[in-house]
Amino acid sequence: MRTGIIAQKIGMTSVFNDKGERIPLTLVKVDDCQVVGHKTLEKHGYNALVIGIKDKKISRVTKPMKQVFANAKISPKTKLKEFRISEGNFIDIAANLEVDHFMAGQFVDITATTIGKGFAGSMKRHNFRGLEASHGVSISHRSHGSTGQRQDPGKVFKGKKMAGHMGCNQVTIQNLKIFAVDRERKLIMIRGSIPGHKNSYLSIKDAVKKNSITV
């Protein structure tokens, strides 16, 4: 198991294949992605690499993190993330990770944070049908309806689907296929859509369920 990388979502576009079929693509950019540190089985109980992306002003870094970057002899990074690895897949600290870490036709898993939607009702958040439009229903047309039973149990169970904050959740989309890799522009083109708004950070790693490469 090798390390993944951190990338930044640029936006979406599309191309047409020889059959005239439209293929939606998401563009992600890998810029200034470096190895910041190691986590070893002897010292930390597991093997992992700490990866950082995009240079950050030194004035915006805390003193403890300044020492971390100083030990690695690299400039401070905006985003850090750990990736679990197997024993023989360590990469030197301060090494650069480029877009050619992956190749066209490869399947990857992408972890990102969904776009926040704020406070949302049950119909938008959970796809409830709502109540009737007439026949005794007034004011509560978009309500979720009953939320419990009676005096016993006398409470609303945890996890009940109700209105509340929607979005801003970390999700992983599996088995997305890499359409192309542009080393000159530092871009990876991925088929389909991925979570998150433009310029948000996401992590890309080898697919757990699909490791074969198809062109």
From Swiss-Prot:
<protein>
    <recommendedName>
        <fullName>Large ribosomal subunit protein uL3</fullName>
    </recommendedName>
</protein>
<dbReference type="InterPro" id="IPR000597">
    <property type="entry name" value="Ribosomal_uL3"/>
</dbReference>
<keyword id="KW-0689">Ribosomal protein</keyword>
<keyword id="KW-0699">rRNA-binding</keyword>
<keyword id="KW-0488">Methylation</keyword>
<dbReference type="GO" id="GO:0019843">
    <property type="term" value="F:rRNA binding"/>
</dbReference>
<dbReference type="GO" id="GO:1990904">
    <property type="term" value="C:ribonucleoprotein complex"/>
</dbReference>
<comment type="similarity">
    <text>Belongs to the universal ribosomal protein uL3 family.</text>
</comment>
<dbReference type="InterPro" id="IPR019927">
    <property type="entry name" value="Ribosomal_uL3_bac/org-type"/>
</dbReference>
<feature type="region of interest" description="Disordered">
    <location>
        <begin position="136"/>
        <end position="161"/>
    </location>
</feature>
<comment type="function">
    <text>One of the primary rRNA binding proteins, it binds directly near the 3'-end of the 23S rRNA, where it nucleates assembly of the 50S subunit.</text>
</comment>
<comment type="subunit">
    <text>Part of the 50S ribosomal subunit. Forms a cluster with proteins L14 and L19.</text>
</comment>
<dbReference type="GO" id="GO:0005840">
    <property type="term" value="C:ribosome"/>
</dbReference>
<dbReference type="InterPro" id="IPR019926">
    <property type="entry name" value="Ribosomal_uL3_CS"/>
</dbReference>
<feature type="modified residue" description="N5-methylglutamine">
    <location>
        <position position="151"/>
    </location>
</feature>
<keyword id="KW-0694">RNA-binding</keyword>
<dbReference type="GO" id="GO:0006412">
    <property type="term" value="P:translation"/>
</dbReference>
<dbReference type="GO" id="GO:0003735">
    <property type="term" value="F:structural constituent of ribosome"/>
</dbReference>
<keyword id="KW-0687">Ribonucleoprotein</keyword>
<dbReference type="Pfam" id="PF00297">
    <property type="entry name" value="Ribosomal_L3"/>
</dbReference>
<dbReference type="InterPro" id="IPR009000">
    <property type="entry name" value="Transl_B-barrel_sf"/>
</dbReference>
